[in-house]
UniProtKB/Swiss-Prot annotation:
Residues that coordinate or bind NAD(+): V18, V37, G47, G309
InterPro entries reported for this sequence: ACT-like_dom_sf, ACT_dom, Asp/hSer_DH_NAD-bd, HDH, HDH_cat, HDH_CS, NAD(P)-bd_dom_sf
Organism: Mycobacterium tuberculosis (strain ATCC 25618 / H37Rv)
Lineage: Bacteria, Bacillati, Actinomycetota, Actinomycetes, Mycobacteriales
EC number of this enzyme: 1.1.1.3
Cofactor(s) it depends on: a metal cation
Catalytic activity: L-homoserine + NADP(+) = L-aspartate 4-semialdehyde + NADPH + H(+); L-homoserine + NAD(+) = L-aspartate 4-semialdehyde + NADH + H(+)
Active site: residue positions: K207
Signal peptide positions (record): none
GO cellular component terms attached to this protein's record: peptidoglycan-based cell wall; plasma membrane
Protein name, per record: Homoserine dehydrogenase
Other known facts: Was identified as a high-confidence drug target.
Transmembrane segments: none
Length: 441
């Protein structure tokens, strides 16, 4: 019976939205969790920055001495949900080095220091779990590390940031510009006071690094991930997207690439992209997340759900806690880091996609042929072209706008083409360059 087993001591570091929910689940579901683990889970302490009486938990559980809490002999598992890279890194390493398993949701730390943390866990023969670091409540880490362990993953792509997906969904459905949609997201609590990490793609890039590392058995850091944000997306881009039967989503894409010489590389990238309305990811709206995994034998799998928030993230954290505690009781370990492949990261210029290019041009004859010539010079094939008038607030035509959709082209060739277009006298400026994804997602 669970009650006959030695209790598993748990320390929780952080008592914000996620930490509070984790503590609530541990306390309110104690009997069920004990049955699933095979022993009671006992909360030994909660690490906070400041000990105050208004935290909703017994004050005797609170401490601001993180190092002392992690070092306690009666703590077997440390749950880290503090957030910042430091002091989280120090606390996690301290726990692992003392032989304690760790559960963390710290994507920023994992995207830069997974190797160091995994090595510390390996040396101490303990577990390091981080399901909640990517896409909140959506189970995607465990399927990649366990369910698909016998398969070859080819591609992982999806929407992994709820803030940007809410903003883009609002722009799509209401016609709002970026600033208005961001203000709405902030008012509803979907965007941080400083939204840079979300809207510039840093958050999604950290998650892409984690997913690529796991899926392809190599080591990818956030610095290896090509990144673009959503701040330059305009209502006009959505209008053109609709005309093409698409919407716009911020995608994280990780894929295995075979070069012409037959060697294997990994690509990891984050950017806004046009997605066909027929694709399942186009229907992922609001703050929801979704991840599509493609594997050789399993084919295409899709995971969908809430990607952020206290309760959804705590669900994933507590799931990891149960796994780590069960291993502790049984004297076993969970999956170890698998980095045997050591694949190089492909530079962005190597990647082939289709492109949507929008530019403001002079409203006179010969402009379209001049624009098309620059694409042809760099062997970028045009699939579709549209030209429309630009009017001022009074309805007077003041210029023209050309939208070009290409066939597959390398990023390097497209970048050269855009630079050349900007140098043309008849082009007043290239306003948008957005990739088209969908057929390979």
């Amino acid at each position: 019976m669970p009650g006959d087993e030695k209790p598993v001591g748990v320390a929780v570091l952080g008592l914000g939205n996620v930490g509070s929910e984790v503590v609530r689940i541990i306390e309110n579901s104690a009997e069920d969790l004990a049955a699933r683990v095979g022993a009671p889970l006992v909360l030994r302490g909660i690490g906070v920055r400041r000990v105050t009486t208004d935290r909703g938990v017994p004050i005797e559980l609170l401490t601001d001495d993180i190092e002392e809490l992690v070092a306690r002999e009666d703590v077997d598992i440390v749950v880290e949900v503090m957030g910042p890279v430091e002091p989280s890194r120090k606390a996690i390493l301290g726990a692992l080095e003392r032989g304690k398993s760790v559960v963390t949701a710290n994507k920023a730390l994992l995207a830069t220091s997974t190797g160091e943390l995994a090595q510390a866990a390996e040396s101490a023969h303990v577990d390091l779990y981080f399901e909640a670091a990517v896409a909140g409540a959506i189970p995607v880490i465990r399927p990649l590390t366990q369910s698909l362990a016998g398969d070859t993953v080819l591609r992982v792509a999806g929407i992994v940031n709820g803030t940007t997906n809410y903003i883009l969904s609002a722009m799509d459905s209401t016609g709002a510009d970026y600033a208005s949609a961001l203000a709405d997201a902030s008012a509803l609590g979907y965007a941080e006071a400083d939204p840079t990490a979300d809207v510039e793609g840093y958050d999604a890039a950290a998650k892409a690094a984690i997913l690529a590392s796991i899926a392809f058995h190599t080591r990818v850091t956030a610095d290896d991930v090509y990144r673009e944000g959503i701040t330059k997306v305009t209502p006009a881009d959505f209008g053109s997207a609709h005309a093409l039967g698409c919407t716009i989503k911020l995608l994280s894409i990780c894929e295995r690439i075979t070069t012409d010489e037959g060697s294997q590389r990994v690509s990891a990238r984050v950017y806004p992209a046009l997605v066909p309305l027929s694709h399942p990811l186009a229907a992922v709206n609001g703050a929801f997340n979704a991840v599509v995994v493609e594997a050789e034998a399993a084919g295409r799998l899709m995971f969908y759900g809430q990607g952020a928030g206290g309760a959804p993230t705590a669900s994933a954290v507590t799931g990891d806690l149960v796994m780590a505690a069960r291993n502790r009781v049984l004297g076993s370990r969970g999956p170890r880091e698998s980095k045997y492949a050591q694949l190089p990261v492909a530079p962005m210029g190597f990647i082939e996609t289709r492109y949507y290019v929008s530019m403001n041009v002079a409203d006179k004859p010969g402009v379209l042929s001049a624009v098309a010539a620059e694409f042809a010079k760099r062997e970028v094939s045009i699939a579709e072209v549209r030209q429309e008038g630009v009017v001022d607030e009074g309805g007077r035509r003041v210029g023209a706008r050309i939208v070009v959709v290409t066939h597959l082209a390398t990023d390097a060739a497209l970048s050269e083409t855009v630079d050349a277009l900007d140098d043309l006298d008849v082009v007043q400026g290239v306003s948008s360059v957005i990739r088209l994804e969908g057929t390979g997602l």
